[in-house]
């Protein structure tokens, strides 16, 4: 008999895997800008597929950590338990609610995933700067990304419960991922000298995907709004909806449009 935790992990991966495209997109954008910069500098031969795959793997693990952490802390707040309209797009993965994984196993999944991200990030930093803890944009985007991943719904920060979750999503899937990928992949140009890094172009390129991923999260908050409001998860939809016997969502829907 297959242990339920393994079945739960498989279910979680299967249901969440399509959403990894939200990570692939910003990494691909950062890589595309990096490739163009290398080509213009006549250094396209320095392109490293190994570094690209490491960046993509580290970013993907960060999203897995964010999703698992969200499942765990939305369970502890009771938000997912009282959600009456869960779907593949909202209400969490449901592996805790249907008993396929314990809350502890989900938390361990989050911690192991973020540990993998940190390990990859430190390795990339060492490859670019010569030191695991070299003071580079890789280190700082890694620190910010880790904070956003675990602090999205995690105690004691709980950005998503305080109305900052949407901003955290935009930052994490926009500038953090795009600019982090770009810095790693253009190391042969800037040679770890910040003034040589074409960060403005990478930042501009990150804005559209930051907004798009944030809107994906926002539109799926409408279904969660009643349960989120009940546990004090003050998303933008909850904050802008009119309260009463029935929650009226016309105002946040107009804002979304």
Label each PLM-derived region with a short phrase.
Residues 91-191:
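Intramembrane alpha-helical segments
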Residues 24-30, 167-182, 237-245:
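Small-residue-rich segments of transmembrane alpha-helices in multi-pass membrane proteins
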Residues 1-8, 13:
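Single conserved hydrophobic/aromatic residue that forms the stacking wall/gate
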Residues 41-69, 137-146, 150, 195-219:
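Membrane-embedded alpha-helical segments that form the functional core of polytopic membrane enzymes
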Residues 18-22, 50-54, 105-109, 137-141, ...:
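Alpha-helical transmembrane segments of integral membrane proteins
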Residues 69-114, 210-256:
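Solvent-exposed interhelical
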Residues 168-225:
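Functional transmembrane core segments of multi-pass inner-membrane proteins
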Residues 29, 33, 37, 65-69, ...:
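Alpha-helical membrane-inserting segments
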């Amino acid at each position: 008999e297959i242990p339920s935790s393994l079945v739960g992990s498989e279910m979680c991966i299967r249901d969440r895997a399509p959403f990894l495209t939200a990570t692939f997109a910003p990494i691909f954008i950062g890589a595309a800008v990096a490739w163009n910069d290398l080509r213009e500098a006549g250094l396209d031969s320095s392109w490293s597929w190994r570094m690209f795959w490491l960046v993509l793997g580290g970013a993907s693990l960060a999203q897995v950590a964010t999703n698992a952490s969200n499942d765990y802390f939305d369970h502890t707040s009771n938000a997912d338990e009282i959600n009456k309209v869960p779907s593949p797009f909202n209400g969490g993965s449901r592996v805790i609610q249907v008993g396929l994984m314990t809350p502890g196993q989900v938390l361990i999944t989050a911690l192991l995933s973020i540990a993998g991200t940190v390990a990859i990030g430190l390795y990339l930093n060492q490859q670019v700067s010569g030191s695991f803890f070299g003071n580079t944009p890789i280190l700082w985007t890694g620190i910010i990304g880790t904070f956003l991943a675990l602090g999205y719904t995690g105690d004691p920060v709980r950005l998503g419960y305080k109305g900052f979750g949407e901003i955290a999503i935009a930052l994490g899937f926009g500038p953090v991922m795009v600019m982090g990928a770009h810095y790693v992949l253009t190391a042969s140009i800037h040679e770890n000298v910040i003034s040589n890094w074409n960060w403005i172009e990478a930042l501009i390129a990150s804005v559209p995907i930051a907004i798009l991923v944030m809107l994906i999260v926002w539109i799926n908050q409408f279904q969660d709004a009643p349960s989120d409001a009940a546990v004090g998860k003050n998303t933008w939809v909850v904050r802008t909806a009119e309260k009463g016997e029935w929650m009226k969502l016309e105002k946040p829907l107009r804002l979304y449009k």
